[in-house]
Amino acid sequence: MRQRNKPWADEYLQENNHIVISDPKSKKGNWSQLFNNNNPIHVEIGSGKGQFILGMAKQYPEINFIGIELAKSIIVSAVQKIEEENLANVFMLNENAIDVREMFADDEISMIYLNFSDPWPKNRHEKRRLTYGRFLEQYQDILGANGEVILKTDNRGLFEYSVVSFSQNGMNINEINVDLHAIQDETNVMTEYEEKFSTKGQPIYRCKAAFEK
């Protein structure tokens, strides 16, 4: 779905630089100082309008969260929600996550969430998928011991591709779920897309995978 342009987005994000970190590369290795604690740090790549990361931050105040979203017209919605809730354990990055190692140091992150990522279904676009090998190499570097990558998607093709990619890149598969809502996981926090697709009866797929460290 094409997002409407919001001319005020740039100014709004600058005004809320206490939520949107403008130079994340300078914080590499020092995110705990920014949060002012040593709690685990979880990262969501592709946060959209922020429903998931806001819900997680409220549900788990003992965990720090960082959401990455490239589209200014979308991330402003997440920032507005965080500002309204006055949450201290979540920051947003208006960045392209093409190489997360530029923003995070080795072993600095405890969890990575990939929620309803673009499936890039054409073979020639395989390298753009966030579960492609070169991305997994980056995740391996920044994840600490026992750190997981958690994928949720409505796209079976991306799900199957990702499970294979995880395995081929040395990850242990901790969970494979082909109908997440059938198990009624009370800890599951839904994204906007997840609510939309699940109300239509579409199965939601989830996979949890981890590197051995």
UniProtKB/Swiss-Prot annotation:
Residues 124-129 are annotated as: Interaction with RNA. Pathway: tRNA modification; N(7)-methylguanine-tRNA biosynthesis. The keyword Transferase applies. Transmembrane segments: none annotated. Belongs to the class I-like SAM-binding methyltransferase superfamily. TrmB family. Catalyzes the formation of N(7)-methylguanine at position 46 (m7G46) in tRNA. This is tRNA (guanine-N(7)-)-methyltransferase. The lineage of its organism: Bacteria, Bacillati, Bacillota, Bacilli, Bacillales.
